[in-house]
């Protein structure tokens, strides 16, 4: 479902999780299996080549305290020009919840609820900034927010 939403999105997507190994890494593996690759990185991908898709769909960027992502500062400094890059997915943990401005992003996915809703509002606010969508046509100046929850049963 998350991957379907990413592929249907008409612009870049921000995915937030409080968990690295139980939240972001499984998403990264799914992205690499489906044709996404790390942004301008010479680092080893997370997946072995035999499991990766050969169809290129875009790049992803990770901002986390424990996962290293090359060129994160280069990408973030592009500001309004972010929409001209091949980055389709930006993944982040709490380190990306404050002090980060994402321009032209069309979707926010919050993978798990947080007991403090102000953190969730901070995450959503990374993509909804003053004039952050000014370079887009008027009909594309919106942000869809997905809040996921899990149930037992």
Language-model-detected regions and their locations in the chain:
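Short, solvent-exposed loop/turn segments at secondary-structure junctions
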Residues: 11, 18-23, 34, 66-68, ...
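Conserved helicase/translocase motor-coupling segment
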Residues: 1-30
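Conserved helicase ATPase core of P-loop NTP-dependent helicases/translocases
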Residues: 41-94
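Conserved SF2 helicase motif VI
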Residues: 116-138, 145
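Phosphate/pyrophosphate-binding and catalytic-coupling "lid/hinge/switch" segments at subdomain interfaces
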Residues: 141-153
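A short beta-strand element within the Helicase C-terminal
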Residues: 101-113, 144-147
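Conserved helix-turn-beta segment of the N-terminal RecA-like "Helicase ATP-binding" lobe
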Residues: 30-38
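A short acidic (Asp/Glu
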Residues: 23-31, 100-105, 119-124
